């Protein structure tokens, strides 16, 4: 159901989510959606939780595998380029992510991703202000990539990350 919800958000936006559209997308009867999710907010919250948890886990894996330095910047640049290469999925994620701006009860879910991104930045710097800037920049760069016909590639993302995290071991 959650994957079906994400596909509906990708295709129709969050406003297109209903028990009926999600069940149809999942190839299930509408009663299945209403059985597992009482309301539309429950579906949207579950989808947001899923993508935030998945993104946070991916960021934590990347940080653990590279441990800081130029390799981690390059790996993050590669990850960002891979993410923007599938703009529909990224758009669905950001639509759900921005839902938390209007619904305070969803903000806790977004913190999982923000904490993982901050942990990645802390592997490069002890400066709390720089950590916040890096996290905001990652979000901003991904969001801006949705607004262009030619999103940045690995090399361009890596150069931007080098400017944000200049003290990583080169």
Q: PLM features: residue spans?
A:
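Short, basic, alpha-helical segments at the C-terminal edge of helix-turn-helix-like DNA-binding modules
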Residues: 49-54
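Hydrophobic/aromatic-rich alpha-helical bundle segments in the mid-to-C-terminal region
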Residues: 106-107, 111, 123-170
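Hydrophobic alpha-helical connector segments
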Residues: 57-90, 134
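Helix-turn-helix
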Residues: 4-42, 46
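Solvent-exposed, amphipathic alpha-helical segments
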Residues: 4-11, 58, 96, 137-144
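Amphipathic alpha-helical packing segments from all-alpha helical-bundle domains
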Residues: 56-57, 84-94, 99-132
């Amino acid at each position: 159901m959650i994957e079906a919800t994400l596909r509906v958000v990708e295709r129709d936006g969050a406003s297109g989510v209903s028990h009926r559209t999600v069940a149809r997308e999942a190839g299930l009867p509408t009663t299945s959606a209403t059985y597992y999710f009482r309301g539309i907010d429950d579906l949207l919250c579950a989808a947001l939780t899923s993508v935030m948890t998945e993104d946070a886990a991916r960021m934590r894996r990347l940080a653990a595998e590279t441990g800081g330095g130029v390799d981690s910047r390059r790996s993050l640049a590669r990850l960002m380029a891979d993410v923007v290469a599938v703009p529909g999925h990224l758009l669905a994620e950001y639509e759900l992510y921005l839902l938390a701006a209007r619904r305070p009860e969803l903000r806790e879910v977004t913190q999982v991703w923000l904490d993982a991104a901050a942990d990645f930045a802390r592997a490069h710097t002890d400066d709390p202000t720089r950590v916040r800037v890096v996290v905001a920049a990652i979000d901003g760069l991904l969001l801006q990539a949705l607004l262009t016909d030619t999103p940045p590639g690995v090399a361009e993302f890596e150069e931007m990350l080098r400017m944000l995290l200049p003290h990583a071991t080169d």
